[in-house]
Amino acid sequence: KQPESRRVEGKTWLLIDAVQDPGNIGTMIRTADSAGLDAVIVGEGSVDIYNAKVLRAAQGSHFHLPIIRGNLHQWIEKLEQNNIPIYGTALKNAVSMYEVTPVDKFALIVGNEGQGVNEELLRKTVKNLYIPIYGKSESLNVSVATGILLYYLRRP
């Protein structure tokens, strides 16, 4: 059963905006679990978190941390009220992840495979981050980028 909690509990959050590939969502849930995050909020336009492929990719992480479907705008307001800084992911108007020092509390918003994070959500962040790419590839898969950023922000 999906958690009903609407309270902000915990210090580290992953917010997922309109990610459509079940393998990506499942991998991000599993990665958030592995990185020790407190909760995952899955926004509108994202694939069903109980899709068979999501469950397979998550490898049981649904049982380890709260995964809540919700309105990301409302959740961002709640997180801000609890002094949790919100970081977005973007290619424009963003700073390298290396310009941010690790923090003990944060929320990270990651976005749709083709469109990225919704512009309205990006305007609500304290900073938008990008991952430097040193090779010839133009981008990273959203679940891979999520893992890199979560572990970077969580490092001691």
Task: Map each language-model feature to its residues.
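Active-site/ligand-binding-proximal alpha/beta "capping" segment
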Residues: 88-137, 141
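RNA substrate-binding interface of SAM-dependent RNA methyltransferases
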Residues: 1, 5-93
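Structured adenosyl-cofactor binding patch, chiefly the S-adenosyl-L-methionine
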Residues: 34-35, 49, 53-61, 119-156
